[in-house]
Amino acid sequence: MDASILLFYVMIFTGIANLILLILEKDGHAGKWFGKVNILFKNKILGLRFFEKIVYDMASDLIPKYKSISVEKGSEGLLEYIGEIVYKSTLFSMFSLAASLILAYAFSNLIIVFFGILSFTSILYPYIDYLLLKGEKDRGIYNELVFFAFTEYICQESGRNIDYALNHVINGRLFKWIRTEAKIILTDLLIHSKNLYNSLRERASNTKATVYRRFLDGYAGIYATGGNLLTYMSHQIEVLKNDLKFRIEQFLEKAQMISEINIILTVIMPIVVIVSSNSRSAGIMQALAFSSLIIYTVAMAFFIEDSRPKTGLGNVKVKPKISEIILTIMVFTVAFIILKNLWLPITIALITFSTIYGYRGKSKLKEARELEEPLPVFVRDIADYRATGKSIYQAIVLSLKEKEYNERFKKEVMVVVNKLSLNSTDLRTDTGIWLFDYVFDCLDLIQKSGGGSTGILIELANMIEDIILEKEKVRRETALASYLTYIAPVLFTLVSASMLALLETIALGTSSGISIFPVNTFQVERDWLYLMIVANTFSNTYITGLLKEGSYENMYLTSITLAIALACILQMDNMVHILKTTVFGAR
């Protein structure tokens, strides 16, 4: 069976599967029925002695590991979690094995069955999850600590110690890893009856995050000696802001390195593609080249996620809708039936998805900027009203009434004002824009703790402004990578056209008079070359989006770069002809 036909069937199957998922999501009765069947089937599988033993053995091994990184997975929760993983991995492995058997039959190659059997290793995912969480925890604490420090600064200004700030964090939704740490410290205080000094020192001795350990040790020492904790917190905020700036500088250096690697790959990849297309094991070489590009893209995505500092937990991402995925698959299917090749339907489908999903993602990123940019001015306006004796509630209402902000910002603040008009005492918001929600969480804490001097509000405004400026600096410094992304498909096409022109000139014998290659050798592999141009363009744009925004949401750029790639591909023959006649002297 031809690989293109097989991929076509795979896409059709995926489309039907997504359609079923959409029906289950929209139809309540169908969803409930499927849920009951799923639970019954799950209980039946996990009730088997073999799977039950796997779950308990893995849980007994992983509980100490999770406790060592202070992750909240108790024995019962961990059993349920591992049971779910074992169940899903079993289903996944069964389907993978069935698919590998079909592929082995279609291609008459039993080696494919081996890959289906390997899919059963997905049952070990809880161990991978532990390793991922272990790295995520340290990064998360670094990202959250400067904001928690200011939360504690607000509490300290009103005469309350760190335990009050920890309680506030637990009752909120803004922090993840600091929230976990807060639960551990408060458990020592309230259940194990330890004093604050011993609780903080013990927690500091059990953490590997250097900045966090120093933060706790310093606070505990000054608390025990009766020093000025407000001054200490002010100093720590400056230290943590400088640490954030340092990590951003490191990230920008890595971003420049990644951009250079992308350009190098763009130049090398056409050579690899054309050489692999004419080797004895062309199919295997092509598969390796394509797989290497996928692995590189995924590896870069993880590397960027690991290196790029976040604002707290980061903003809530816009997820693709099932309808968008189904539409993309339908576009691919229709284009494949009409055009009878693979690269062009994939290009059209990717442009379709990048446009419809990218538009929503672009709108979300624009909304984030519209909510973040007025925050420093807004907080300073509140500080001005506080200086005249107004409460936080009154200052928010007056700022919205008398000051000028953009419409999106005013709309979200109006939600808070409406709550206040109904005698609500909760100022917190849930927009999904982390920095905006954090500012209102601080205002809520100021109101409830009885603090909120003009000075502390000005310091909050300055800190938020510094954070926004650093985020803008990242976007500005990575702008070059965006410009190079537009050039990448042109560069890929130019290198490819140059090689094709040279090889076809040699094939025609114009250089030496000897026919070394058949004339049609390169024409047959054009579809593969075009597919790699599209894949390389998509990879470059995806990586650039992660570098600039820290998010895959800005896929609108992908539709533009893919359109450039498509235009370059359509002009490939003309470019080859021009190079043959002008550079290599062919007639």
Write out the residue ranges for each language-model feature.
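Juxtamembrane/interface alpha-helical elements of multi-pass membrane proteins
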Residues: 111-204, 327-430, 438-445, 452-474, ...
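Transmembrane helix interruption/hinge and helix-loop junction motifs
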Residues: 2, 105-112, 279-285, 335-346, ...
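Membrane-anchoring hydrophobic segments
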Residues: 5-9, 154-261
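Membrane-cytosol interface segments
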Residues: 1-71, 239, 359, 366, ...
